[in-house]
Amino acid sequence: CPIGAHSDHQLGKVTGFAVDQGIRMAYRAKKSGIVEIRSLNFATRAQWHINAVPDKCQNDWADYLRGATWALAKRYPLTKGVCGIIEGSLPIGGLSSSASVIITFLSALCKVNNIHMSEHEMIMTALDAENNYVGVSCGKLDQSCEVYSKKNHLLYLDTKDDSFELIPQHPDMKPYKIAIFFSGVERNLAGSKFNMRVDEAKSAAYALMAYAGMDYGKFEEARLRDVPREIFEQYKDRLPENWRKRATHFYTEFERVEKGAEAWRRGDIEAYGRLSFESGHSSIYNWET
């Protein structure tokens, strides 16, 4: 996500690219309904039945796969499990690795159970697994990038109405390379302060709605996308510092995404790059990732 980070859970607009790394899985169907899975990236194996997924996370790497099973079983009858080996070339906790492993495993379960899901349904099932089983309050950016992205195109997605566009690289765009650096720091969003920051953004939306006399409903439904920026500018000084920072990131990032999509469309890679660096700066200092 070059521009649009940390705004999908607030129903913002985002951009995304495909990368040439990912998750690979070799598998076969198991008529018994048992899932037996081994990862070449971790020492332990995991096993469960497709219709008896543990109610709670086991706090290991396979929780994402259990979540995928749980989310799919809510939508379709499952009769077959899988026996497989999974391997990834993505850094753990980075580059959408959790979304990638969920979608890879969902695809395998769908294949052996003869289930045909639309792209949007695949995204929402993967999001359900991560939100409601693993317990990460993420939005749909990562899942959408995994499903929709196309080589030499920029994904431009509105996470509020799910409309998206794949903007092709302009024929006159200057040559460029995108470098991704692995810091060596691995993380697990479920065990980080990620959820707290999402709640701070929701709290800012909830408070701004109240200050402005808007109908603010339930906390879970409060999103900054539903609060006009003019309201934020009017009442931002009343917000606690952390809430104000999260909201500042959202509103400035929303503007950067729109400008970035237009810069990409006209082939201005330098402008797009500047906006991407500004996005990273805001992620560090306003979102405090």
Task: Locate each region found by the language model.
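ATP-binding N-lobe of GHMP and related small-molecule kinases
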Residues: 1-96, 103-120, 124-134, 138, ...
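Short N-terminal signal/transit or membrane-insertion segments
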Residues: 99, 103-118, 245-261
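C-terminal nucleotide
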Residues: 24-60, 71, 153-289
